[in-house]
């Protein structure tokens, strides 16, 4: 059956061809439901990371999450404050995330490094496994810097997915939900931290094993 309307011929019961926006949204949702869960699965992998069942990874996992989320908080505070100053702040990638700024990145990095150093000196267990420090002070500073920078990349990646999907927040991405807005900074941090943790533990394996005997 054919229906003629305003000179346009369509087939009854046949849906319109998918638009570019719909295709982009579908691809973004697929990317979110595949790549992001794969990245975040490294969080439980760190928790269950062990050479023997006696290894307690909870403090070091909390350390990773803490310095990353503190970077988020510092970036938000610094970015919000500088945005209200005369002349505003300097945007990072306005097309992807209009509110992200260089001032926010600097503020987040300072907050992350300071938090990492506080953990190192005041809570040694957070950089240790069974009493053996796996991160030195220089490594802790580097981790603080990278947690801020790489965490920002995860945030930007999530923002790009949301824009491609035409969603204001990640709650509109099927299978992910608004929780992604909380975990976005860990998308790239968790797998990289896991990889570095493998390297650090390998260097300290002999000492760690002594404490497990």
Task: Indicate where each model-derived feature is located.
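Interhelical loop and helix-boundary elements at the membrane-water interface
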Residues: 2-188, 211-213
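Juxtamembrane boundary at the C-terminal end of a transmembrane helix
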Residues: 197-213
